């Protein structure tokens, strides 16, 4: 969570139950000055509250369809995609394997847990990425389920079938997700 809204990654107690009052003002100001509101990373409650506040189309710059990853709040469910389309917005499909395929997502958590254990067992600083990157890469190369472009296309087709081609785009997240 931050000062603006709750995060989809915070699975514990949410700070604002969606948007904070400050967040509502931020959305209004973004509308006023012509800045697009990006709802990737926000909690479901924050998403719907942004949709209620914004007067211009919003985007999900790098999200995918929860239809294929049911327990992944970071992705959008069908009702959210419909609401975003009603707003004139676009969902830009994230290419990361664990965003587009549940089986891939299921391989990620055990690897991440093993990497965390490696960091702890070797007294490494978790913020010193270089100190454990080689180990992390080895683990992902051996154990992670990478998916094909067909899985990404399934998400695109799902959005097109749900709300039309005008409301889907590409949002690779390649600068932050390499698998």
Label the model's feature ranges:
Residues 1, 35, 40-47, 63-66, ...:
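Active-site beta-loop-alpha junctions enriched in small/polar residues
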Residues 90, 94-96, 140-149, 159-162:
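Extended C-terminal subregions enriched in glycine
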Residues 128-154:
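Intrinsically disordered, low-complexity acidic Ser/Thr-rich regulatory segments
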Residues 93-98, 163-179:
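Short acidic/histidine-rich active-site segments
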Residues 50, 70-72, 102-104:
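Short, well-ordered secondary-structure micro-motifs
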Residues 77-135:
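Aromatic-lined glycan-binding groove of carbohydrate-active enzymes
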Residues 3-15, 26-33, 59, 64-65, ...:
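Active-site-proximal beta-alpha loop/turn segments in soluble metabolic enzymes
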């Amino acid at each position: 969570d931050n000062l603006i809204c709750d995060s989809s990654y915070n699975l514990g107690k949410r700070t604002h139950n969606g948007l904070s009052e400050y967040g509502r003002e931020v959305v209004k100001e973004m509308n006023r000055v012509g800045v697009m509101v990006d709802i990737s990373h926000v909690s479901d409650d924050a998403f719907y509250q942004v949709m209620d506040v914004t007067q211009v189309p919003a985007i999900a710059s790098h999200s995918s369809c929860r239809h294929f990853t049911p327990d992944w709040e970071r992705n959008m469910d069908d009702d959210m995609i419909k609401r975003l389309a009603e707003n004139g917005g676009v969902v830009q499909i994230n290419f990361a394997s664990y965003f587009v395929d549940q089986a891939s997502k299921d391989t990620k958590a055990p690897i991440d847990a093993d990497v965390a254990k490696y960091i702890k067992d070797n007294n490494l600083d978790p913020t010193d990425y270089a100190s454990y990157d080689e180990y992390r890469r080895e683990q992902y190369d051996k154990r992670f389920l990478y998916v094909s472009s067909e899985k990404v296309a399934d998400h695109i087709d799902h959005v097109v079938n749900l709300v039309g081609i005008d409301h889907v785009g590409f949002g690779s997240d390649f600068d932050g997700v390499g698998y």
